[in-house]
């Protein structure tokens, strides 16, 4: 059986026609799934009994079940553990803002990139998520909170560009007016920096925001924090970023997790200013998530502000990420890891 969420409207129409069914039934089915959030063919009232049986015999609606849900005290952040049909578990986080609800979705079960500050990668990657499985996190979360989600961040477990085909198919699906109709400018894709795939993404010319996990302006330290840096130097990464900016005319966000005594000095701030000078970019400073598997500690607020001020003085737009749901916000991957290890 196939997950119907992996299908576009046109693909479902073609399939129905091949089974001597009416093509317009595809639009009705999509309306039930994406607008009414009905995930059982038998509950689709305007679909004939024969067609329901045909769909049920060939497809499943692959929305994961909620195995754990945490809500912050201020009720602005929800953390979900979702379980797919094969028993694999991933995390998603919903954040409520005045301008709308955002969701951070996972693109893989686990991750193979090995970044030292991330709990998602500690057990390696189990498998890629399909386009429909990524999409289904949004739908499951919308049903749980009873509100529309209008912004998507691909920043959960997994490296999106390590699952390039499925992730780009997801981008095509989620932005379609036949599904969730989320605008491309409301989507951010975060990568550790797979250089060839950044260029390939640029060639697709999406209007999404690309976020690069940088975390150091120096190759030696970046290699220590992020194994991907052993394959691609900062020079190569910056060249790929320039290609992306020139191709899409979109500003890149550089994410920089500040670790006390490691990458938070004035020297590093000045070096980062030099590396990014003249680029159409924005820097997002992040107090590092502390996980027990490493000794990284959050930089002090004073250091973070001083670091940011150096960047601003050099003409680089900089913000400090607002921490939401601190009372439930274990580092990305920790909730899943603690649940799976039980």
From Swiss-Prot:
Cofactor note: Binds 1 [4Fe-4S] cluster. The cluster is coordinated with 3 cysteines and an exchangeable S-adenosyl-L-methionine.
CC cofactor: [4Fe-4S] cluster
CDD domains in alphabetical order: Radical_SAM (cd01335)
Molecular function per GO: 4 iron, 4 sulfur cluster binding; metal ion binding; rRNA (adenine(2503)-C2-)-methyltransferase activity; rRNA binding; tRNA (adenine(37)-C2)-methyltransferase activity; tRNA binding
Positions that bind S-adenosyl-L-methionine: 158-159, 190, 213-215, 289
Domain Radical SAM core, first and last residues per copy: 97-327
Keywords, comma-separated and alphabetical: 4Fe-4S, Cytoplasm, Disulfide bond, Iron, Iron-sulfur, Metal-binding, Methyltransferase, rRNA processing, S-adenosyl-L-methionine, Transferase, tRNA processing
Annotated compartments: Cytoplasm
GO cellular component, one term: cytoplasm
Keyword Magnesium: no
Domain of life: Bacteria
N-terminal signal peptide: none
Binding site for [4Fe-4S] cluster: 111, 115, 118
One Pfam family it belongs to: RlmN_N
Reactions accelerated catalytically: adenosine(2503) in 23S rRNA + 2 reduced [2Fe-2S]-[ferredoxin] + 2 S-adenosyl-L-methionine = 2-methyladenosine(2503) in 23S rRNA + 5'-deoxyadenosine + L-methionine + 2 oxidized [2Fe-2S]-[ferredoxin] + S-adenosyl-L-homocysteine; adenosine(37) in tRNA + 2 reduced [2Fe-2S]-[ferredoxin] + 2 S-adenosyl-L-methionine = 2-methyladenosine(37) in tRNA + 5'-deoxyadenosine + L-methionine + 2 oxidized [2Fe-2S]-[ferredoxin] + S-adenosyl-L-homocysteine
Record NCBIfam families: rRNA_mod_RlmN (TIGR00048)
Matches recorded under HAMAP family: RNA_methyltr_RlmN (MF_01849)
Miscellaneous comment text of the record: Reaction proceeds by a ping-pong mechanism involving intermediate methylation of a conserved cysteine residue.
Protein name per its UniProtKB record: Probable dual-specificity RNA methyltransferase RlmN
Annotated source species: Clostridium botulinum (strain Loch Maree / Type A3)
Species classification: Bacteria, Bacillati, Bacillota, Clostridia, Eubacteriales
Gene name of this polypeptide: rlmN
